[in-house]
Structure formats: C-alpha cells, structure tokens
Amino acid sequence: MLDIDKSTVDFLVTENMVQEVEKVLSHDVPLVHTIVEEMVKRDIDRIYFVACGSPLNAAQTAKHLADRFSDLQVYAISGWEFCDNTPYRLDARCAVIGVSDYGKTEEVIKALELGRACGALTAAFTKRADSPITSAAEFSIDYQADCIWEIHLLLCYSVVLEMITRLAPHAEIGKIKNDLKQLPNALGYLVRTWEEKGRQLGELASQWPMIYTVAAGPLRPLGYKEGIVTLMEFTWTHGCVIESGEFRHGPLEIVEPGVPFLFLLGNDESRHTTERAINFVKQRTDNVIVIDYAAISQGLHPWLAPFLMFVPMEWLCYYLSIYKDHNPDERRYYGGLVEY
C-alpha cells in the first residue's frame, strides 16, 4: 500500500466537494438560468452538449434526463465526433454547449467555433474565466471548482431542468429541482461516512487485474466515467463497461469463478434489469461489488443517483489505486507528457 498524505492528492476531490456544490447552486445555476432564458427567447429547440471524458459522461446523463421527462431534443457528443461528423442540422435554433474543465480541449473549442459560424447559440462551462474556450463561446460560466463530476453534472442538469420547466413542465422535474437543495448535505454525509467502506472495497478491488462495470438507467454514464475514465486513467486498471440490459446478449458468457464485476445499482425503473445481472453473476463468481443507491439515497430522487453514487466510487477508486502502490495523480502520457 502506498504511504501518501491524501490531502496532497489532486484526484481526491472530497475535501471541498460540499462547499463547491453549495457555491455552484447559489451562484452558477442562476447564471445557467440566464442562458436558458436567452435560449427560450431565440426559440432554441435543439441542444448539443459537446465534451470529452468525464464532462461528456456528465452531459450524457443530462441528455438521458431530457429524454426521460420531455420531448426536448438534447444530444451529448464527443468533441471530434461533432467536428468530424457535424450534425446536419446546426442553425440559429440550436445551442452548442461546450464543457471542458481547463478549457483547452481543442475539439470542444472547434465545435463551438463551428456552431457559432452556423448561427447557433454557444456557451462554455469551464473552470477559469481566462480559459481558451471562453473566447469561442457567446456565453460562459467559470465555476472555479475542482469537483468536476458534481459541477459538470449540476450545470448540465440545470440546463435541461430549466428548459423543461419553461417549455413543458413535468411533475418529476419539480421533485428533482426540490431535492437538489438537499444535495450538499447528502454529499457531506457520504463523504464523512463512506471512506472506511470505500477503503475496504478498494483493497478488495486492487487484487483484481481488471474490472467489468455494469450499470443502467441514469447511472449508465457514471458507469463509463468510473469503469473506463477513472479506472484506466487514475488507477491504471484495465476496465470494460456493460449496459445492464445488454448483459445477457453476449457478456454473460465470460462469467466464471474469479472474474470481477462492479455493479452500480439505481432505484429507478431500471433497477430490476441490473438486479437480474447481479443475481446471475453472484451464482458464478464471488468477485462482486455492488454499490446500491437505495442504501445511500437519503430519500433523494432516483435521478440524483449519479450525484451521490460518485462519492462511494471516489473513495473506492482512490484506495484501489493506493493499494496498488500507485499515486492516482501520476501520468505516463496524458496531459501533454507524450505527443498524441
């Protein structure tokens, strides 16, 4: 196990998470509402979120939210996919919202430039006001925070929640917006109470050479964020992500003793689908971890699961890396260390 002061590890964002979420709720979400007001004035009826990595997964979650509770046309597209295969419809009734923490992601900047050239409303969500991405967008929000999963998810959710509220109100959207007020306290509770459990699960998972992550519903994008982005980039663990409903269509054939699985189990309508996969796997291997939203939700809406489930996964992945004697901040290639 790596001997390290966790307060020095940039990967671990639990320390200031609650304060950052409180700040975004009080200061930045109203700025999102101002942008949405302009979108409504311009009769925007199609939204393209463009991002990469974790920010893309946050945007995908918001896209699923829109699909579930509205007929709003929302897309979440990877940067180069947007640039290389630019949507046929890109005009003045479209919005292109680029999400990039450092604001230097070239393909996201290029996507905003493409959108602006076609007359689309453009906005950027980034950490700093002087980020390069802000010059490519008509509107920008610099959130000045480090817990990017929570922040990006909150900002993208706020776009969708406000658009639905203004254009086609839905009872569930009102419940989600109301429960968001309780988010800081709920996150704080998990930060305080889940570290030891995360340590135990991280130690267990550190013995596995790779991990299959399985999720469904609103947790699908978080499954990718944790099972691919976090495991590969930060813990140097081989990973693969499977959608719960697709588990029986091929993946079930690799289940056998010793094969490791991590399940993210929500309490939305897709719960039974993931439970079916869990039951199948548990009969054939003991290497199973289940993170269950029902056990940590504190009564919050099922579509807030991606916010809360992040905390157990943050602790698990941090300790997984530490037990593998790896500092999750260490890189071999990423961030310009090697030309790509």
Swiss-Prot record:
Keywords: Hydrolase, Repeat. GO terms for biological process: fructose 6-phosphate metabolic process; protein N-linked glycosylation; UDP-N-acetylglucosamine metabolic process. It catalyses: N(6)-(6-phospho-D-fructosyl)-L-lysine + H2O = D-glucose 6-phosphate + L-lysine. CDD domains: SIS_GlmS_GlmD_2 (cd05009). It comes from the Bacteria. Coiled coil: none annotated. It is an enzyme of class 3 (hydrolase). Its EC number is 3.5.-.-. Pathway: Carbohydrate metabolism; fructoselysine degradation; D-glucose 6-phosphate and lysine from fructoselysine: step 2/2. InterPro entries: GlmS/FrlB_SIS, SIS_dom, SIS_dom_sf. GO terms for molecular function: carbohydrate derivative binding; glutamine-fructose-6-phosphate transaminase (isomerizing) activity; hydrolase activity. Catalyzes the reversible conversion of fructoselysine 6-phosphate to glucose 6-phosphate and lysine. Functions in a fructoselysine degradation pathway that allows E.coli to grow on fructoselysine or psicoselysine. Homododecamer. This is Fructoselysine 6-phosphate deglycase. It comes from Escherichia coli O157:H7.
